[in-house]
């Protein structure tokens, strides 16, 4: 071995087979690269295939979902990377993200809080082909009143009455382009027919409702007396009642809508085995009972309760989703 500072060996001292070895190495290099690419295809990004993690996009309220997910992790050792969404645009924003990621899925499990967007995603091929999604428990769309300002007997018996002059400037609702409010209005279109529905939407908007950022805000408006009545979700009414707010839900009618939670596994989920475990866990009766106990859900037997409200033809609702949504934009986003 040459000492430090010594002249480098001359070319005549280079090993005679140097070029041959170099040529062989260059020949092997493309095959090594191909092998690496194949391995990356089989196990992309290494840690993403960990058996101890699952990514879930969640539209259920974070305050209700987190204890359930913590219980799942404690039982299985699988960490849940949870992505939640905002009150104002939840479900729609998550749905758009899942649609955008179809070619390179980042999510394993979708925990939805209403049915329409889940059906839309299923129709768009976002979920796996078999055992793709299921409904889990239910809550409902309700009218909420301020009990200090009106009695149940004084409350309207139909949503059609909300366009009467007596309710001018007295009704609160969330933006009807997102979440359960959009689903409810689109289901009403399916029941009433397009002409009656469009006329009602226009008359309702002309009656100066408070259109606010989310169903919990609807209940707050009613609780504070800023509105006498609101169109919202049963779990938001329950949350306000726990805090002592003077609000009450009107009984279910033929115009009410039962809204199940949904659970789905994404097609080509990065973590299929943990995804299946979470999918099964969220369907357990005891998990549903926990959500009912905190009034995030009203019950677990959707089939037995479905007769209490609207029963939309979901295929027709999906078929008309885009034009009907455009009508809602034109009416409520002036």
PLM regions: where:
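Periplasmic-binding protein-like
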Residues: 169-176, 281-302
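A bilobed periplasmic-binding-protein/Venus flytrap-type ligand-binding module shared by bacterial periplasmic
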Residues: 142-149, 259-274, 290
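Ligand-binding pocket segment of bilobal, Venus flytrap-like solute-binding proteins
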Residues: 176, 180-183, 187-252
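Short beta-strand->loop
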Residues: 128-135, 160, 229, 245-257, ...
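An extracytoplasmic/periplasmic, membrane-proximal ligand-sensing/linker region
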Residues: 195-197, 299-334
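A structural signal for short loop-to-beta-strand junctions that line the ligand-binding cleft
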Residues: 105-110, 126-143, 160, 170-173
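Early extracytoplasmic/lumenal segment of secretory-pathway proteins
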Residues: 48-120
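Flexible hinge/capping segments at coil-to-helix
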Residues: 151-167
């Amino acid at each position: 071995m040459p000492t430090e500072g010594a002249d480098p060996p001359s070319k005549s001292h280079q090993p005679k087979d140097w070029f041959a070895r170099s040529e062989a190495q260059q020949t092997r290099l493309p095959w090594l690269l191909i092998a690496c690419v194949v391995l990356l295809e089989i196990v992309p990004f290494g840690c993403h295939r960990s058996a101890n993690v699952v990514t879930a996009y969640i539209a259920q309220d974070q305050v209700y979902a987190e204890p359930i997910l913590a219980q799942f992790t404690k039982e299985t050792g699988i960490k849940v990377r949870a992505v939640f969404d905002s009150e104002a645009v939840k479900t729609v924003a998550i749905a758009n993200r899942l649609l955008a990621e179809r070619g390179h899925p980042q999510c394993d499990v979708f925990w939805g809080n209403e049915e329409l967007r889940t059906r839309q995603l299923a129709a768009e091929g976002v979920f796996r082909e078999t055992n793709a999604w299921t409904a889990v428990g239910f809550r409902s769309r309700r009218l909420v009143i301020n009990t200090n300002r009106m009695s149940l007997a004084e409350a309207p018996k139909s949503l059609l009455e909300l366009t009467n002059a007596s309710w001018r400037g007295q009704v609160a609702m969330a933006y009807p382009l997102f979440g359960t409010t959009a689903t409810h209005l689109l289901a009403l279109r399916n029941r009433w027919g397009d002409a009656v529905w469009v006329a009602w939407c226009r008359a309702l908007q002309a009656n100066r409702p408070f259109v606010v950022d989310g169903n919990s805000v609807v209940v707050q408006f009613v609780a504070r007396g800023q509105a006498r009545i609101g169109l919202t979700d049963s779990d938001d009414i329950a949350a306000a009642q726990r805090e002592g707010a003077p609000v009450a839900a009107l009984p279910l009618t033929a115009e009410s809508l039962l809204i199940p939670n949904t659970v789905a596994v994404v097609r080509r989920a990065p973590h299929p085995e943990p995804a299946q475990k979470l999918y099964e866990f969220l369907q357990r009766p005891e998990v549903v009972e926990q959500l009912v106990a905190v009034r995030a859900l009203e019950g677990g037997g959707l089939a037995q309760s479905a007769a209490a409200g609207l029963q939309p033809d979901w295929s027709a609702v999906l078929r008309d989703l885009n034009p009907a949504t455009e009508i809602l934009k034109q009416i409520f986003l002036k």
